Amino acid sequence: MSEKKTTHFGFQQVPVEEKAQRVAEVFHSVAAKYDLMNDLMSGGIHRLWKRFTIEASGVRTGHKVLDIAGGTGDLSYQFARLVGSSGQVILADINASMLGVGRDRLIDRGIAGNIAFTQCDAQYLPFPDNTFDCITIAFGLRNVTDKDLALRAMQRVLKPGGRLLVLEFSKPHNELLSKAYDTYSFRILPFMGKLVTNDADSYRYLAESIRMHPDQQTLKGMMDDAGFVNTEFHNMTGGIVALHKGIKP
C-alpha cells in the first residue's frame, strides 16, 4: 500500500486532502474580524503594502483583473475604481465566509456593475485561457496546497503580456529583525487573536504558515518555472513582506 501524500499545515504535516478543509476552518473563524485584525497586527502598514501593489500593477481603464484570495476586497475596491465601467474585476476566494464579507463590504462602499464574485480554488481557476490583464494574490499563496499548480493556473488565464503580482509575507533579511519578528509572531499574535476573535489557534497557524512559505528567491524561481518572465521581487518592511512580479510572455 502506498503512503498518503502529505503537506504542511503550519508546522504540522497533514494529508493533502485535509489541508484545504483546515485552512477553510481558519478563515471561517476569522472572517468577521479579519480587517480589524489586519490593522492591529500590522499597525495599519498592510495598507501601504497594498497601495504599493496597486501602483505596481499597471492596471488602467478597460482592464480585466482577477483578485485571487481577494477576501474582504481591499485590492478589488481600488481596481474597480481604476478599470472603470469598461473594465471588470473578479474577486475570487475559496472561502465562502471571506467572500461574503468582501461582497457586503464592497456593496456598502458603492462598488457595483464592474465587479463579480467567484468562489474558486486558485489551483483550478474556472476561467478561459488568456482572459486577464492582471492577476493579484495578496497574503493567499502561502495557504494554497500546491503552489506550483496554482502559479501555472494563473499563467494560463493571463493574457500574453499580462502581469501577476504576489504580495506575501516573506523572510526578513536582518537577523535582529528576524528574531524580533519571531517573538512578535509566536507570542503576541496568538494573544491578540485570543483577545479580539477568541481564537488563538488560527493566529498561531498564521505565524507558522508564514515560516513555511518559500523565501524570496525560491518563490521567484517557482514563478520562472511556471512560465513567467522578467520576474522580480521588492522587499518591504525589511523583507517581512515581499511583492513578486512576473509577466506572461
From Swiss-Prot:
The lineage of its organism: Bacteria, Pseudomonadati, Pseudomonadota, Gammaproteobacteria, Cellvibrionales. Belongs to the class I-like SAM-binding methyltransferase superfamily. MenG/UbiE family. GO terms for molecular function: 2-methoxy-6-polyprenyl-1,4-benzoquinol methyltransferase activity; demethylmenaquinone methyltransferase activity. InterPro entries: SAM-dependent_MTases_sf (IPR029063), UbiE/COQ5_MeTrFase (IPR004033), UbiE/COQ5_MeTrFase_CS (IPR023576). S-adenosyl-L-methionine binds at T72, D93, D121, A122. Pathway: Quinol/quinone metabolism; menaquinone biosynthesis; menaquinol from 1,4-dihydroxy-2-naphthoate: step 2/2; Cofactor biosynthesis; ubiquinone biosynthesis. It comes from Cellvibrio japonicus (strain Ueda107). SUPFAM superfamilies: S-adenosyl-L-methionine-dependent methyltransferases. It catalyses: a 2-demethylmenaquinol + S-adenosyl-L-methionine = a menaquinol + S-adenosyl-L-homocysteine + H(+); a 2-methoxy-6-(all-trans-polyprenyl)benzene-1,4-diol + S-adenosyl-L-methionine = a 5-methoxy-2-methyl-3-(all-trans-polyprenyl)benzene-1,4-diol + S-adenosyl-L-homocysteine + H(+). The gene is ubiE. This is Ubiquinone/menaquinone biosynthesis C-methyltransferase UbiE.
